[in-house]
Amino acid sequence: MKIHEYQGKEILRKFGVAVPRGKPAFSVDEAVKVAQELGGPVWVVKAQIHAGGRGKGGGVKVAKSLEQVREYSNQILGMQLKTHQTGPEGQKVNRLLIEEGADIKKELYVGIVIDRVSQKVVVMASSEGGMDIEEVAEKTPEAIHKVAVEPSVGLQDAEADDLAKKIGVPDASIPQAREILKGLYKSFWETDASLAEINPLVLTGDGKVIALDAKFNFDSNALFRHPEIVAYRDLDEEDPAEIEASKFDLAYISLDGNIGCLVNGAGLAMATMDTIKLFGGEPANFLDVGGGATTEKVTEAFKLMLKNPGLKAILVNIFGGIMRCDVIAEGVIAGSKAVNLNVPLVVRMKGTNEDLGKKMLAESGLPIISADSMEEAAQKVVAAAAGK
């Protein structure tokens, strides 16, 4: 689950991280009112969407008068903001963050993720903060410094100080940077985040260290422990199909291709998409029906995939372990009939009650294309999507 920048800053404040004064605004008049409350002479008008690259996309403006606050708010609010993370369609801006300006002397970067190889939380920092951190990571990875934190003790003062020095924080500002790094780590740990990022972390002209941005992603499996985080959820920022899928315990992610995938198990789902790509196709979605796929779930899965106007074919790839193949076959047949399936359907099933499941599909009277291996299934669905 993702949240907005202003919500991330609310979390950072709770953990002692210095952030600029600011408030969200949902209308132009409210934006001007917030600016008046903050006082000038400089304000920043920031689009609030669940995507990075807002500055390059025209979603962040520096205003030097209340008239400019109104002008920029009017420009940004309601716009379809396009960034490298939104896709070509962009994302509509429904809210703004109005905050006080800062005298920026130097932009830095700090971020925290989980390294599954070392099984530790890794704190990253770079002296090359700002809008092009992705380019820094790609072209000069040595500019990003890392420390793997021992979970039982957390981020230590010496580790935080060492990171701060490596990214060029002056000695006089090291204590401030230490508090920010430790506060960011604590916020990451205590909220069950999967990503916590400040970009940029800035050094100001008067020697202060301030988090000028905040980005959090949270582990959806841990949200039951954090109702205060769930309250931050903005459904306007989420894919309607993914929201609908969550109601039926379906793990669904929309993609840009034209071949729908219905699979049980995340690993098999990813392998299925890779195999489709291998044979020249493009997956339209990731869809894991899990180990308890009922007829209702399969039907809803078909409905979700068919909402994609670019869908050309569907591949059902099932390994019958806990889930029996005959149950899946029953769901596929019922689901196909319920939605009047009008695209080619390729089904590959292996495992428990495999023969029975195949027999049910063969006798269903539906134009289902069967396959014995994942490679054969992928080749057949790619050909079907191409109209061959």
From Swiss-Prot:
Pathway: Carbohydrate metabolism; tricarboxylic acid cycle; succinate from succinyl-CoA (ligase route): step 1/1. Substrate binds at residues 264, 321-323. Keywords: ATP-binding, Ligase, Magnesium, Metal-binding, Nucleotide-binding, Tricarboxylic acid cycle. Binds 1 Mg(2+) ion per subunit. GO terms for cellular component: cytosol; succinate-CoA ligase complex. Its cofactor is Mg(2+). Mg(2+) binds at residues 199, 213. The keyword Ligase applies. The keyword Endoplasmic reticulum does not apply. GO terms for molecular function: ATP binding; magnesium ion binding; succinate-CoA ligase (ADP-forming) activity; succinate-CoA ligase (GDP-forming) activity. It catalyses: succinate + ATP + CoA = succinyl-CoA + ADP + phosphate; GTP + succinate + CoA = succinyl-CoA + GDP + phosphate. Its EC number is 6.2.1.5. One of its GO terms (biological process) is succinyl-CoA metabolic process. ATP binds at residues 46, 53-55, 99, 102, 107. Residues 9-244 form the ATP-grasp domain. HAMAP family: Succ_CoA_beta. Belongs to the succinate/malate CoA ligase beta subunit family. Succinyl-CoA synthetase functions in the citric acid cycle (TCA), coupling the hydrolysis of succinyl-CoA to the synthesis of either ATP or GTP and thus represents the only step of substrate-level phosphorylation in the TCA. The beta subunit provides nucleotide specificity of the enzyme and binds the substrate succinate, while the binding sites for coenzyme A and phosphate are found in the alpha subunit. Heterotetramer of two alpha and two beta subunits. This is Succinate--CoA ligase [ADP-forming] subunit beta. It comes from Burkholderia mallei (strain ATCC 23344).
